[in-house]
């Protein structure tokens, strides 16, 4: 049986996450009291109507504070039943959450006459502390639109063919912000930039003209070898420490050329020695 617990601050994308999971065969329960988590898991295990039990539950600030405090105990009880249970935590920066609430005109679950929306959003972080501390996967949705979030959720949660650590190697552009949910970040902006070659500007690091240009640059090759040597040595240590998810981010200026090229190469070589290696290009449209 597999269970995914979805949590996060209001406005971060939890409803979208549940929709994605439901579309992919998960039985979903929204706003489950944390104290009922072990009981729900037990009932799902003995339910003969579920050929392959896939369960997703949302636990967030709508819970009683006393239930959230007990979350670590409830999670431990679930895992003692030999259930593969992942905790997903979604978040976004405060300005983005404020904007989303302003656009939808929805009421924050913690807002009152004496508590502003900004205060409610900040208080929510403290309330969800017990869940944040135990999250296996954290996704920051600040720079993701609805479709990008759905793709990210499918990639991280549903494309994990085997148990163990799932490694995501992700290219990005610094001009759109650094991915705050990355575990390791490599800055490759010091490398020769194909953008300044008019004939290469409109191509990406996935296309042969850019590949041909970057593959003969000594600094690019040296950077690749250094990053690969580091990852090849240390990623197995991450896996040995029972990490469920590790995100490695490779950044250049725009996220179209250098970071894409290196991310593709690193993904190809690491897939030869590690299981569950995924590649994503955040800023390629």
From Swiss-Prot:
Displays ATPase and GTPase activities. This is Nucleotide-binding protein Psyr_4150. Belongs to the RapZ-like family. Keywords: ATP-binding, GTP-binding, Nucleotide-binding. ATP binds at residues 8-15. GTP binds at residues 60-63. One of its GO terms (molecular function) is ATP binding. Transmembrane segments: none annotated. InterPro entries: P-loop_NTPase, RapZ-like, RapZ-like_N, RapZ_C. The lineage of its organism: Bacteria, Pseudomonadati, Pseudomonadota, Gammaproteobacteria, Pseudomonadales.
């Amino acid at each position: 049986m597999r269970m995914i617990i979805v949590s996060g601050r209001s406005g971060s994308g939890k409803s979208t996450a549940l929709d994605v999971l439901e579309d992919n065969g998960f039985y979903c329960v929204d706003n489950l009291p944390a104290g009922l988590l072990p009981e729900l898991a037990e009932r799902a295990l003995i339910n003969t109507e579920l050929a392959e039990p896939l369960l997703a539950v949302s636990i967030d600030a709508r819970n009683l504070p006393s239930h959230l405090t007990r979350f670590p105990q409830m999670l431990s009880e679930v895992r003692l039943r030999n259930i593969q249970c992942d905790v997903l935590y979604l978040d976004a920066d405060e300005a983005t959450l404020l904007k989303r609430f302003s656009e939808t005109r929805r009421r924050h679950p913690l807002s009152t006459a004496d508590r502003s929306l900004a205060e409610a959003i900040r208080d929510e972080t403290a309330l969800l502390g017990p869940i944040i501390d135990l999250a296996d996967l954290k996704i920051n949705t600040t720079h993701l639109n609805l479709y990008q979030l759905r793709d990210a959720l499918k990639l991280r949660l549903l494309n994990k063919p085997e148990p163990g650590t799932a490694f995501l190697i992700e290219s990005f552009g610094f001009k759109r912000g650094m991915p705050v949910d990355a575990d390791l970040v490599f800055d490759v902006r010091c490398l020769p930039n194909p953008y300044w070659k008019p004939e290469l500007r409109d191509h990406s690091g996935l296309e042969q003209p850019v590949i041909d240009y970057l593959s003969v640059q000594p600094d690019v090759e040296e950077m690749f070898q250094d990053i690969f040597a580091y990852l090849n040595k240390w990623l197995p240590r991450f896996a040995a420490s029972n990490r469920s998810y590790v995100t490695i981010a490779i950044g250049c200026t725009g996220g179209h050329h250098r970071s894409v090229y290196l991310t593709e190469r690193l993904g190809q070589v690491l897939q030869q020695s590690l299981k569950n290696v995924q590649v994503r290009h955040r800023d390629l449209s």
